[in-house]
């Protein structure tokens, strides 16, 4: 079984290793109440300046419904990345439905800060 072809607009796409790291961190940030689920919520965190980074699903249908986020991320200097599966992203977010975009948010004194920074650097390396 081959993986479905990913829309070329979904750039940068995380590889398998980074996807696992991302989804683990998304799951932890959900436990620490540092996660906003959904494209609209992600947009709000960007506008308020409280987004650490944005994770989007490359298999959102149609993809255009989340393609305003990369532009906003670039304006606000927030790293963003695509993962292949909205189902996997939904599971990592702790909901039973697919999630096409989520935002890990800033929180003072967060225990996740070191992991968040290492993921931000990994995403920024993809963007270069």
Swiss-Prot record:
Assembly description: Identified in the spliceosome B complex. Component of the U4/U6-U5 tri-snRNP complex. Part of the small subunit (SSU) processome, composed of more than 70 proteins and the RNA chaperone small nucleolar RNA (snoRNA) U3.
Major location (coarse): nucleus
Summary of the function given for this chain in its UniProt record: Part of the small subunit (SSU) processome, first precursor of the small eukaryotic ribosomal subunit. During the assembly of the SSU processome in the nucleolus, many ribosome biogenesis factors, an RNA chaperone and ribosomal proteins associate with the nascent pre-rRNA and work in concert to generate RNA folding, modifications, rearrangements and cleavage as well as targeted degradation of pre-ribosomal RNA by the RNA exosome. Involved in pre-mRNA splicing as component of the spliceosome. Binds to the 5'-stem-loop of U4 snRNA and thereby contributes to spliceosome assembly.
Keyword ATP-binding in annotation: no
Location relative to the cell: Nucleus; Nucleus, Nucleolus
Family: Belongs to the eukaryotic ribosomal protein eL8 family.
Residue numbers spanned by region Interaction with U4 snRNA and U4atac snRNA: 36-48
Site (Interaction with U4 snRNA and U4atac snRNA): 61, 86
Keyword RNA-binding: yes
Sorted UniProt keywords: mRNA processing, mRNA splicing, Nucleus, Ribonucleoprotein, RNA-binding, Spliceosome
Protein name: NHP2-like protein 1
Species assigned in the record: Xenopus laevis
PANTHER family in UniProt: RIBOSOMAL PROTEIN L7AE FAMILY MEMBER
GO molecular function annotations of the record: RNA binding; U4atac snRNA binding
PROSITE patterns in UniProt: RIBOSOMAL_L7AE
Region listing for Important for U4 snRNA-binding, in residue ranges: 96-128
UniProt-listed GO biological process terms: maturation of SSU-rRNA; mRNA splicing, via spliceosome; ribosomal small subunit biogenesis
């Amino acid at each position: 079984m081959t993986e479905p072809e990913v829309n070329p607009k979904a750039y940068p796409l995380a590889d398998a290793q980074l996807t696992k790291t991302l989804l683990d961190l998304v799951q932890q940030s959900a436990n620490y109440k540092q996660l906003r689920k959904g494209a609209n919520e992600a947009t709000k965190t960007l506008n308020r300046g409280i987004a650490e980074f944005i994770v989007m699903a490359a298999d959102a249908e149609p993809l255009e419904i989340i393609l305003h986020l990369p532009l906003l991320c670039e304006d606000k200097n927030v790293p963003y990345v695509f993962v292949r599966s909205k189902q996997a992203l939904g599971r990592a977010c702790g909901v039973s439905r697919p999630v096409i975009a989520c935002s890990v948010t800033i929180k003072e004194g967060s225990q996740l800060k070191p992991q968040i920074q290492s993921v931000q650097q990994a995403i920024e390396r993809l963007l270069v």
